[in-house]
Amino acid sequence: MLEVVNIPLESLNLSTILPMAVVIAGALVILGIDLFTKNSSRSFYTMLSVIFIVLDLGAVLYFEGYSRGFFDFMLIDGISILSQFIILIASALFIPLALTSKRFHEFSYPEYYALFLFMIAGFQFMVSSDHLILIFVGLETASLALYTLIAMHNRQSAFEAAIKYFTMGALAAGFFTFGSMLLYVASGTLELNVMAEVLVERDFQPSWLVFAGFVFLCSAIGFKISLVPFHTWTPDVYEGTNSVLAGYMSVVPKIAGFIVAMRFFDIFLASEIEWVRNLLYFLTILTITLPNIMALVQEDVKRMLAYSSISHAGFALAAIMINTTQSTSALFLYWILFLFTNLGAFTMLWVSRSKINHWNHRYDHPYERFSGMARIMPVGAILMGIFMLSLAGVPPFAVFWGKMYLMSSALNSGFIVLALIMAVNSAISAYYYLKLIIYMFLKEPQKSNERDVFMKNATMPLRTIIGLSASVVILSVFFVDRLLDFILKYVEYSGF
């Protein structure tokens, strides 16, 4: 006869799943409202989504220090809190953009908002666990919702993008499960902190099994955060989806992937397994450099920003590879500042979107579209120029501070060559960012009567989000120290 197991409710510490429960409840409320009423506006669903995201953020910031719960599947620590903070801030900035011109019909469906909230919960589960099963559940929940959100744009290119993303996601899921299985065989556990103890005790033997498991899991993570050579899907998928969702994808799925990578790679880096550090060093250099070179030859601004985002992911991987408290703090500082810059840049692409393409019919956002933008829409050109200068790492704009602190952490840890490579690539990237600025300010407008091309979708919510993003980018010099202190406090909670 099976023995009855008595588990006190207090020991489950169910408060650890409260943030995810909030947005899941929000998604179910939206679906329930749609079931009983068919005439609710997207303004109503947008407002509901923002309310639940804000409640979720409040639940996240309620935690301090370190806690586990839900049969030890859940882990709330400093990096979990910081990453959820980034996810929710980005989501709160994204969802009001649904209040745009009526032709973006996907925002009229309540299912869009429900899927978006389910996706947020998936990302939160990913970053709030060190158990490979729950990480996988979160990964697939978020991915399946995101595939659908991309396809709901209802253009041929959006369907193609969703299929490409789904195919790569399915491959990554296969790699993740196979790698997890091999590491389970080697260690007897799927909990990363216990796995680390067991592997260290066994001196990472059997080595071939550990190596194979590492390679498969590293490949899965590489697909999700667009590391070279697993990045090839990224430009096509970003090009096919709508611009602001592409901007969101360049930030939120990647921070979730970075946290998983940080927890997993720390098993090997903390034990000073040299071949792992060398492999990550090589991937870092490759991911920073190759997309930069590819971005130089792009004819479409959106594809250029896609390759740019891959290169920025390489900077984040450098922080993970260095694996110090300073580098981990630099990663979060970098990504918070990158969030506002990149989301602002992609939103500007949407503002200048038009059904009529007078320039290059192969692309939606060729450089020629922005010719003479300073004469047609001077404020828009200045804002886009600020976002480009920030992405290039030009002081005193936001991303400069992230790059500077990250390079400082590399120098302090003895990675002098890596710091030089980051500096050189920042200089290279300035070419394609400045290229867009030259088109906007120094080229003649190709169509003198095309004022309606620009600010086509510039509703008040879009103007507000762009203005807020630009304000953070410009004024970051005044609050970056306090932001860094805030980040450092939570990183130290985690022991990184």
UniProtKB/Swiss-Prot annotation:
Which Gene Ontology cellular-component terms appear in the entry? plasma membrane
Localization recorded for this chain is:
Cell inner membrane
**What EC number is given for this enzyme?**
7.1.1.-
Name the enzyme group at the top EC level: translocase
The record's keywords, sorted A to Z, are:
Cell inner membrane, Cell membrane, Membrane, NAD, Quinone, Translocase, Transmembrane, Transmembrane helix, Transport, Ubiquinone
Stretches that traverse the bilayer? 16-36, 43-63, 79-99, 107-127, 132-152, 166-186, 208-228, 249-269, 279-299, 304-324, 331-351, 381-401, 414-434, 460-480
Bilayer topology reads: Multi-pass membrane protein
| Catalytic reaction annotation | a quinone + NADH + 5 H(+)(in) = a quinol + NAD(+) + 4 H(+)(out)
Q: Which InterPro entries match?
A: NADH-Q_OxRdtase_suN/2 (IPR010096), ND/Mrp_TM (IPR001750)
One Pfam family assigned to this protein is Proton_antipo_M
Keyword Cell inner membrane in the entry? The reply is yes
* Biological process annotations from GO: ATP synthesis coupled electron transport
Superkingdom is Bacteria
Q: How does it assemble?
A: NDH-1 is composed of 14 different subunits. Subunits NuoA, H, J, K, L, M, N constitute the membrane sector of the complex.
Q: Which family does it belong to?
A: Belongs to the complex I subunit 2 family.
Q: What does this protein do?
A: NDH-1 shuttles electrons from NADH, via FMN and iron-sulfur (Fe-S) centers, to quinones in the respiratory chain. The immediate electron acceptor for the enzyme in this species is believed to be ubiquinone. Couples the redox reaction to proton translocation (for every two electrons transferred, four hydrogen ions are translocated across the cytoplasmic membrane), and thus conserves the redox energy in a proton gradient.
What this protein is called in its record is: NADH-quinone oxidoreductase subunit N
Taxonomy of the source species: Bacteria, Pseudomonadati, Campylobacterota, Epsilonproteobacteria, Campylobacterales
- What gene is it encoded by? nuoN
